[in-house]
Regions:
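Core structural elements
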Residues: 1-7, 187, 208-223
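Short coil/turn segments at secondary-structure boundaries
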Residues: 4-13, 45-52, 74, 152-155, ...
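Sequence-specific dsDNA recognition surfaces
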Residues: 13-18, 33-49, 63-94
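Non-catalytic DNA-recognition/assembly elements of restriction-modification systems
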Residues: 13-43, 167, 175, 179, ...
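Hydrophobic alpha-helical scaffolding
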Residues: 21-25, 85, 128, 132, ...
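Proline-centric
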Residues: 21-30, 122-134, 146, 150, ...
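A short beta-sheet element
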Residues: 61-63, 73-143, 155, 165
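Extended, well-ordered alpha-helical scaffold/bundle regions in very large, multi-domain proteins
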Residues: 220, 228-229, 243-247
Length: 254
C-alpha cells in the first residue's frame, strides 16, 4: 500500500497521517534524532562574577545568530572558569550548525569560531560519514522543516523541547541529492539578494515578496522538486541504514 510505517522497538506504527506532504520515492521520512544528535547550551549564573569577568570565549545568544549565515562574534564572552565549571571545559567546534531552539525558533547559523552558547540554542551534529553535506542541507532547510511540523500548540507558542525536536519528522533525500539541492539553493542566493536590494529601493514593491520568493525555493527543495531526480542516486533508505550502523558503532564504543 501507499501508507508509511515506522518501527519503534517491536511495534510498527502507521505514521501516514502525520506526514505534511509527499516526497520522492527514493527519499525517506525519518525522525530528527535518527540523523543527528544535538546539545543544548547553558547560561552561567549572572551573579557570579568569576564566570563573566575577563571573558575570553564567545558565548552565543539568539541575538548573535544571523539567519543562514556564518557567525564569528558575540556581545558577551565567558571566562576560562565558566568554561571549566559550566561547560566541562568543552567548546563547540568551529563549523558546527547552530539552531535557535526557543523564542525565535528555527534560525540557523554556522559557527565561524570555537565557542559556547546558551540554552535557547542547540548545536547539531549529523550522524553520517559525510557530515558536511547533511550539515549544509539542514542549515538551509531546518527552518522550513520546523515550520512545516508546527503541529502542536507548544511549537506554535515558540516553545520547542528536546523530546519534540528529537521526534520531529524530517524529509531526508539521498546524500548526492542533498549536495545538489544545496548547490541549487546557493545559485539562487545572489539573485534573491539582488532582488532584496531592489526591493528596498522601490517602496511600492510588495514587502513580502522577498520572503515569499526565498520560501518558495526552499519549499521546492524540501519536497524534492528543486533538482531532477537521479535514478542512480543511492536511496535515502540505504543512507539511513549507514547512519544507524554508525550510530550503533559509536554507542558500542562508549
Amino acid at each position: 500500500d501507499n501508507r508509511h510505517y515506522e518501527k519503534v522497538g517491536s511495534e510498527v506504527k502507521d505514521i501516514t497521517d502525520d506526514l505534511p506532504f509527499e516526497i520522492p520515492d527514493n527519499w525517506v521520512w525519518t525522525r530528527f534524532s535518527q540523523i543527528a544528535s544535538f546539545e543544548l547550551g547553558k547560561t552561567p549564573d549572572r551573579h557570579t562574577d568569576k564566570f563573566w569577568n575577563n571573558g575570553i570565549y564567545p558565548w552565543f545568544a539568539i541575538s548573535d545568530l544571523q539567519e543562514r549565515s556564518t557567525v564569528f562574534s558575540t556581545k558577551e564572552k565567558i571566562s576560562a572558569t565558566a568554561l571549566k565549571e559550566k561547560f566541562a571545559g568543552k567548546l563547540v567546534p568551529q563549523g558546527t550548525l547552530l539552531m535557535s531552539f526557543k523564542l525565535t525558533v528555527g534560525r540557523t547559523s554556522i559557527l565561524g569560531v570555537d565557542a559556547v552558547h546558551n540554552e535557547a540554542i542547540i548545536s547539531v551534529f549529523p550522524i553520517i560519514p559525510d557530515k558536511d553535506a547533511t550539515r549544509n542541507f539542514l542549515f538551509n532547510l531546518l527552518p522550513l522543516i520546523v515550520e512545516y511540523v508546527e503541529t502542536t500548540d507548544a511549537i506554535k507558542g515558540a516553545t520547542l523541547n528536546s523530546s519534540k525536536l528529537s521526534s520531529m519528522l524530517v524529509p531526508f533525500p539521498p546524500l548526492t541529492e542533498q549536495i545538489r539541492i544545496v548547490a541549487e539553493i546557493e545559485k539562487f542566493e545572489p539573485l534573491i539578494a539582488e532582488y532584496d536590494k531592489l526591493e528596498q529601493q522601490a517602496t511600492k514593491l510588495d514587502e513580502e515578496i522577498y520572503d515569499k520568493l526565498k520560501k518558495s525555493i526552499l519549499q521546492y527543495a524540501i519536497q524534492g522538486k528543486l533538482v531532477p531526480q537521479d535514478p542512480n542516486d543511492e536511496p535515502a533508505s540505504v543512507l539511513l541504514e549507514h547512519i544507524r550502523a554508525e550510530k550503533k558503532a559509536k554507542l558500542g564504543k562508549k
